[in-house]
């Protein structure tokens, strides 16, 4: 049994929460890593060995997260993407499988609809599926199976972590109904491009930490080409001339981040530095200038990015993200106690202080000194009064991914 309020299911068939899904996965992995169990033995022990597991979750905070993630007022729009699987058996014995890709192709090519893959409602999606099926099925065909469901868009994930302990207090793997246990958890199981959040952990942080740069170290913001790649800033046009690392953080300046990576250190060291902060998804092909902008092969998980920034919040001390504090066997003996884990100094405390100071300013209204350009600080939408805050935003091309990662001392 997992000893915590979040596991008490109101109905036998109710799926586990995202938190419990991740707690379960981490417990099985830790039983292997710390006690040398096989995966099968760890799994059997978890589900039928009478274990007691103490969660790190704060139920009151989890309730707030769930309410805010699912509050439609927090989103500019509400669309639905479709997952559809349909199998037909023809009278000649052949079997044909269809999916939402076939549906979308039919809508564009046959119906002539300029369609981006998102429906206005679940009912609208089902209506088009039914129309498509009517054209597919003959009297002699036999339906072998069908799966249909919609997913609210845009989707979201959220991680709330205590940076001093690594304990995860609340998590959300997505908005909308969670249909089954161990379903897709967008906070821990989905790799997304991190955008400008990576400027800190692959470029600015290692430059300060390893090479003695400061927030006042300048780089020249101008047209910048390396090989066949020309780098641009996120705003429309123009350049700011000499700008410091502090400016690069506050205004999220692409060229400053790339020049810092290439002129103060190198992409290999930038990758190693991110990995030292717990990023595990980088590959050799990521060792290029685009690393400074989060242009990487596979992306990162929300959990690992939160873990990396939690290191900055914790004066440079790294804690692995934890979903439980203790595991006890059926006799009450402690098998694992994560509260005894010691943090690892992953960056100098002075580096963490400087990065925090710059990220505080990125959340306040600031404007770059340039008469012909309107370049403002990039994280102001996450700011609220009454509390000291630090953080960094990140976006990718056409706003496919939008990030904010930040912290307070409370």
Label the predicted regions.
Residues 13-22, 55-63, 178-179, 192-197, ...:
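Soluble non-cytosolic domains of exported or imported proteins
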Residues 55-75, 82-90, 95-150, 154-162, ...:
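A penicillin-recognizing enzyme superfamily signal
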Residues 65, 165-166, 192-219, 248, ...:
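Active-site SXXK
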Residues 151-157, 179-201, 216-219, 290:
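Short active-site loop at a secondary-structure junction
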């Amino acid at each position: 049994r997992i000893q915590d309020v979040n596991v008490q299911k109101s109905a036998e068939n109710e799926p586990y929460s995202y938190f419990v899904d991740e707690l379960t996965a981490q417990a099985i992995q830790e039983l292997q890593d710390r006690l040398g169990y096989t995966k099968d033995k760890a799994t059997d022990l978890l589900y039928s060995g009478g274990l007691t597991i103490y969660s790190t979750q704060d139920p009151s905070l989890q309730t707030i997260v769930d309410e805010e993630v699912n509050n439609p007022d927090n989103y500019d729009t509400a669309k639905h993407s479709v997952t559809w699987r349909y199998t037909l058996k023809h009278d000649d014995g052949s079997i044909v499988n269809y999916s939402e890709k076939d549906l979308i192709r039919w809508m564009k090519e046959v119906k002539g609809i300029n369609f981006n893959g998102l429906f206005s409602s679940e009912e609208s999606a089902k209506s088009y599926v039914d129309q498509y099926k009517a054209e597919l099925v003959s009297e002699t065909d036999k339906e072998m199976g069908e799966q249909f469901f919609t997913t609210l868009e845009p989707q979201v994930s959220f991680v709330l972590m205590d940076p001093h302990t690594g304990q995860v207090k609340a998590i959300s793997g997505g908005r909308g109904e969670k249909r089954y246990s161990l379903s897709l958890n967008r906070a821990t199981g989905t790799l997304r491009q991190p955008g400008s959040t990576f400027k800190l952990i692959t470029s600015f942080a290692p430059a300060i930490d390893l090479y003695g740069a400061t927030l006042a170290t300048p780089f020249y913001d101008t047209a910048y080409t390396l090989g066949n790649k020309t780098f641009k800033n996120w705003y429309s046009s123009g350049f700011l001339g000499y700008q410091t690392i502090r400016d690069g953080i506050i205004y999220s300046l692409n060229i400053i981040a790339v020049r810092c990576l290439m002129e103060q250190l190198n992409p290999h060291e930038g990758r190693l530095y991110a990995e030292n902060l717990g990023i595990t998804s980088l590959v050799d092909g990521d060792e290029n200038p685009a690393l400074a902008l989060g242009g990487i092969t596979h992306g990162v998980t929300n959990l690992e990015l939160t873990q990396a920034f939690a290191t900055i919040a914790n004066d440079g001390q790294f804690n692995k993200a934890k979903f439980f504090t203790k595991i006890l066997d059926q006799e009450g003996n402690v098998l694992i106690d994560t509260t005894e884990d010691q943090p690892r100094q992953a960056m100098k405390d002075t580096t963490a202080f400087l990065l925090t100071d710059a990220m505080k300013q990125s959340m306040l209204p600031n404007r770059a000194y340039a008469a012909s350009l309107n370049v403002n600080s990039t994280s102001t939408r996450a700011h609220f009064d009454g509390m000291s805050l630090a953080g960094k935003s990140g976006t990718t091309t056409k706003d496919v991914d939008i990030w904010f990662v930040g912290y307070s001392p409370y």
